[in-house]
Amino acid sequence: MEKLHFKEMGSGQKIVIIHGLLGSSDNWITIGKKLSENFHVYLVDLINHGNSPHTEIFNYFRMADDLYNFFHFNNINKAHLIAHSMGGKVAMKFADIYQNHIDKLIIVDIVNKGYPTNRFNYIFNALKNIKTKNIKSRKDADQHFSNYINNLSERNFLLKNLK
């Protein structure tokens, strides 16, 4: 059980927001700030994303349990849950298991169906084949990613996650 990293703002009814694959809480900061004018907002980094711990166990059941523990550690009995893409899959699993903890469920850009498991292989190949000792700058990383990923926006999204 890992403690998830999060950003917190505002007061009132609680809203928990979860990012998508390869994203982080930073993806929702603008919307979170706006919502915090009327709500108590939590922007959560799922495991293996953002500033949350990294682990080899990575599946929807595990992430739903991590989210349950996040609710517990932060004394959240019930909240509105907003989730994007892969985070939406986590939120749906959470709602299935822990429905009493959800007030409203808002899923963005994903449906409850199976998707091809190879859909993002080109991105995972780029990440798997990076030689970190050869990367001295974001430009070096972008050059590596460009061998696998043609779309500049996708490369920039990956580059945002570099530390």
What residue ranges belong to the model's regions?
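Active-site loop/oxyanion-hole signature of alpha/beta-hydrolase fold enzymes
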Residues: 29, 33, 42-82, 86
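Flexible "cap/lid" loop of the alpha/beta hydrolase fold
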Residues: 92-97, 102-136, 142
